[in-house]
């Protein structure tokens, strides 16, 4: 073979190799605060509620004992990356995206915790903030802090996908989410599949609970086909882009310009919504600043 032709082939192959998507399962240590053992027998119902929703959790156990004991715990971490993005998924904690960064500037575009320290927020108690929490069919779903099924798939177009999912025991709904990274693309894609194998109609929601490092420059761009907004326990709905519902917060003393949230319409502005600072702001100023 002509040496010049071989050199040209190698030069052409080098950038193609750099664009390859890599996927692997590794063991990594993460500082973790342990939780106590649950009741041996699952609790049917004790009148417990969580964030405005009924706390029926049977047949799941209740993980509501937090401890101050911190250990270095080994986790199975599923990693997915190309030359632009690097994703870490924890199948042992609900299949959540634990970390995601832009490799071009080392910026974590999802909020990344430095350790695992649960709080009593989830349906079953223990819950972790940060990253991306997948919620089907309820908010802060039952298995958010539990191990779920996972598999890896290499696709014909060169992309690679990590699928996480389960059969939810309370409603028997089957769901899976495929997190994909593509060659030479700087985004992460999530595809959702939900199957109702039961003979009954089931109510459900899908909520990707995304945590980010928020500042005055951060913007969230909403799809143009948004028609209404809902609170996170499927009870209250409101119009879009100007919502007048109280979002179940009539007793919550959140003040905007001297008014409680119950007295003040909630602004859902079309196109772009910026993160509001913690300072009080009148509705007139909000409309002036964000329109």
What residue ranges belong to the model's regions?
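Hydrophobic h-region of N-terminal signal peptides that target proteins for export
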Residues: 9-18
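Sec-dependent signal peptide recognition
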Residues: 2-9
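A contiguous, surface-exposed recognition patch within enzymatic or periplasmic domains that forms
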Residues: 31-38, 42, 76-81, 85-103, ...
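Generic hydrophobic/packing signal
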Residues: 13, 104, 166-168
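Acidic-aromatic substrate-binding/catalytic surfaces of carbohydrate-active enzymes
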Residues: 22-60, 75-147, 286-291
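Extended, loop-rich substrate-binding clefts of extracytoplasmic carbohydrate-active enzymes
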Residues: 44-72, 79, 129-187, 216
């Amino acid at each position: 073979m002509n040496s010049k032709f071989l050199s040209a082939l190698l030069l052409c192959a080098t950038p193609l190799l750099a664009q390859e998507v890599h996927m692997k399962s590794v063991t990594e240590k993460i500082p973790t605060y342990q939780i106590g053992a649950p009741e041996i027998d699952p609790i049917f119902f004790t009148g417990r509620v969580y964030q405005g929703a009924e706390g029926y959790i049977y047949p799941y156990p209740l993980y509501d004992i937090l401890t101050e004991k911190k250990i270095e715990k080994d986790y199975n971490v599923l990693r997915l990356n190309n030359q632009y993005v690097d994703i870490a998924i924890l199948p042992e904690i609900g299949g959540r995206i634990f970390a995601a960064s832009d490799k071009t500037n080392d910026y974590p575009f999802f909020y990344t915790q430095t350790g695992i320290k649960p709080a009593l927020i989830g349906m079953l108690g223990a819950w972790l903030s940060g990253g991306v929490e997948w919620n089907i069919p309820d908010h802060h779903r039952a298995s958010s802090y539990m191990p779920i099924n996972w598999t890896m798939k290499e696709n014909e177009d060169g992309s690679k996908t990590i699928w996480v999912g389960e059969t939810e025991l309370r409603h028997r709904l089957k769901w899976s989410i495929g997190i994909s990274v593509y060659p030479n693309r700087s985004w992460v894609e999530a595809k959702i599949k939900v199957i109702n194998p039961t003979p009954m109609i089931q109510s459900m929601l899908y909520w990707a609970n995304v945590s980010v490092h928020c500042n005055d420059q951060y913007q969230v761009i909403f799809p143009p086909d948004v028609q209404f907004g809902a609170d996170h326990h499927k009870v209250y709905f409101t119009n879009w882009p100007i919502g007048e519902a109280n979002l179940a917060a009539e007793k919550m003393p959140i003040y905007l310009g001297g008014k409680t949230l119950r007295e003040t319409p909630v602004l859902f502005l079309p196109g772009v919504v910026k993160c509001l600072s913690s300072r009080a702001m009148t509705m007139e100023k909000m409309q002036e600043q964000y329109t």
